[in-house]
């Protein structure tokens, strides 16, 4: 078996395609009208056809039990870009206890999107502050071998 992507139901396909392109830079790789695949194997499905596929008229949006997760190597540039996108935030940008910066916001149908700083960039950011691999591993609560691997990438 092979995992091939995540499908989310959307109420307005054109609005969603525009959002995912303009905010996250995702391009359409396949467009079948009611079903659209974007870069990264994110699949958009119209709400009407999703109801048919799952044989239910009860669809719950505004659910905070899952998210689409992306990583960004230039977090400062992305956060600057995001300020001009008019998104509704789950929370403002923050730094997790392990040092990774992240932001969560909603798509047009209130699906949660997280954009986190690429973990290799977190390691390199700490290294730029003259932290040793041992110090970085302790700060991030990760194995020292992981830190050393990140530093060579």
Describe the residue ranges of each PLM region.
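N-terminal beta-strand motif that seeds the catalytic metal site of vicinal oxygen chelate
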Residues: 1-14, 66-68, 118-153
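Compact recognition or signaling/catalytic modules
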Residues: 2-10, 37, 42-47, 81-82
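Amphipathic alpha-helical segments
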Residues: 12-27
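Vicinal oxygen chelate
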Residues: 13, 65-112, 129, 140-145, ...
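Short secondary-structure junctions
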Residues: 25-30, 89-92
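Conserved short beta-strand elements that form part of the metal-binding/catalytic scaffold
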Residues: 27-62, 112-117
């Amino acid at each position: 078996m092979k995992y091939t992507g995540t499908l989310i139901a959307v109420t307005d396909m054109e609005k969603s395609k525009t959002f995912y392109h303009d905010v996250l830079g995702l391009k359409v790789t396949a467009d079948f009208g009611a079903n659209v695949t974007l870069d990264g194997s994110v699949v958009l499905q119209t709400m009407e056809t999703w109801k048919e596929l799952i044989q239910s008229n009860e669809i719950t949006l505004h659910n905070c039990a899952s998210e689409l997760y992306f990583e960004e190597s230039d977090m400062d540039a992305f956060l600057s870009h995001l300020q001009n996108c008019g998104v509704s935030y789950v929370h403002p940008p923050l730094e997790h206890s392990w040092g990774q910066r992240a932001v969560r916001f909603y798509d047009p149908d209130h699906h949660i999107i997280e954009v986190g700083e690429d973990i290799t960039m977190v390691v390199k950011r700490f290294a730029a502050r003259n932290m040793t691999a041992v110090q970085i591993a302790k700060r991030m609560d990760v194995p020292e071998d992981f830190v050393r691997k990140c530093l060579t990438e």
